[in-house]
Amino acid sequence: MTAPRTLYDKIWDDHVVHQAEDGTCLLYIDRHLVHEVTSPQAFEGLRMTGRKVRAPEKTIAVPDHNVPTTEGRDTKIDNEESRIQVEALDKNAKDFGINYYPVSDIRQGIVHIVGPEQGWTLPGMTVVCGDSHTATHGAFGALAHGIGTSEVEHVLATQTLIQKKSKNMKVEITGSLRPGVTAKDITLSVIGLTGTAGGTGYVIEYCGQAIRELSMEGRMTVCNMAIEGGARAGLIAPDEVTFAYVMGRPHAPKGAAWEAALSYWKTLYTDKGAHFDKVVTIRGEDIAPVVTWGTSPEDVLPITATVPSPEEFSGGKVEAARRSLDYMGLTPGMKLTDIKIDTVFIGSCTNGRIEDLRAAAAILKGKKIAPGMRAMVVPGSGLVRAQAEEEGLAQIFIDAGFEWRLAGCSMCLAMNPDQLSPGERCASTSNRNFEGRQGRNGRTHLVSPGMAAAAAITGHLTDVREMMAETV
């Protein structure tokens, strides 16, 4: 009789091709996602050595990081470096025969939204991409993580990856969430508790009633930020919610293949008595709408709190807090709800899905953004954009004063035209608030879509629950 295994153990064991004496393993990779920024050198390496892509049918490419989100981008991209990278991906996809969603394709979008949307991401798979937020796909019970450019070339050439196994960590969210609290609040609260190094060396399995009650889109938000918590990957065991989401998608199994896959997927859970090296438990009812105040995702507090003083920290974190407050232009003791906002960004692979847009639109309906506010919504894919237009969400955003953009990574990172100016303060639904992340000397506060919408209306960080009470 075999020892009880975690979900991570099971997926890992099913993909080990070879294990060396020191524990280093060669893992088979089921899906390789590719974008324009981390792939050019990898494809060039294949050309120089005369190699082909080993499994083009399992390789999916889409430009997303530095594409403009304004009209006309399918015929002209002004930034030379961006244009060269997108053109290179066009050529590489054609030359190597991989699956490709170009800028002109309505299915184009952020790679971590396109993959699940098209049914490429399935339970029990190994998924890699030259991008740290590949952890998103763990919401399906897939082992998914980012890789470097040299590893991108290795996977393209061999469909395998060399790595050592991580340790097992469990994050359990018990009970149910209160109204106004979202998946974004869960994942930020976990990072706030454990720190950005709390998951280092681990693969996290998220579980508990609050996780089970999330939609697939909410689960993707939670797993998306596992990397911000230091983890190699994040996982959620697949269940009926997962299966219902996957069924009928373009690249999901059909007929007898579906039944066979479903039979396997139902074995993907952590066995009773399986060992975790680290366990963190949070009560769902204790989680509130949160916002980051500093320059690390762990600098997070409930929206009802005040800006902390550096003296509240210890060790090296005292100076880090002092630097964060200086960069963010904040004073200890001020209410978070008194922090004025210049810009609101709703989008990214964390919160650019249709449910995120619905949540924001519900707050914005019939309202206008604050005078002088710059606000934009960037759907995570062309299909999300089309659905939002069909549901009337786009018109709500436009009527409120938001810019309604094309799909892409946009203001999540300063690699395209959507950037903050020095000193500009943004309430953002993205995943990182590092110095300069959204533009040189820009200031980022990470929030949920509803919180972002509330800030757009009032002009300052706002408790979304107050807005929800007004709409009842």
UniProtKB/Swiss-Prot annotation:
Its EC number is 4.2.1.33. Binds 1 [4Fe-4S] cluster per subunit. The keyword Cytoplasm does not apply. Its cofactor is [4Fe-4S] cluster. One of its GO terms (molecular function) is metal ion binding. Pathway: Amino-acid biosynthesis; L-leucine biosynthesis; L-leucine from 3-methyl-2-oxobutanoate: step 2/4. It holds the Pfam family Aconitase. The keyword Iron-sulfur applies. It is an enzyme of class 4 (lyase). It catalyses: (2R,3S)-3-isopropylmalate = (2S)-2-isopropylmalate. Heterodimer of LeuC and LeuD. Belongs to the aconitase/IPM isomerase family. LeuC type 1 subfamily. Catalyzes the isomerization between 2-isopropylmalate and 3-isopropylmalate, via the formation of 2-isopropylmaleate. PANTHER family: 3-ISOPROPYLMALATE DEHYDRATASE (PTHR43822:SF9), HOMOACONITASE, MITOCHONDRIAL-RELATED (PTHR43822). This is 3-isopropylmalate dehydratase large subunit. The lineage of its organism: Bacteria, Pseudomonadati, Pseudomonadota, Alphaproteobacteria, Rhodobacterales.
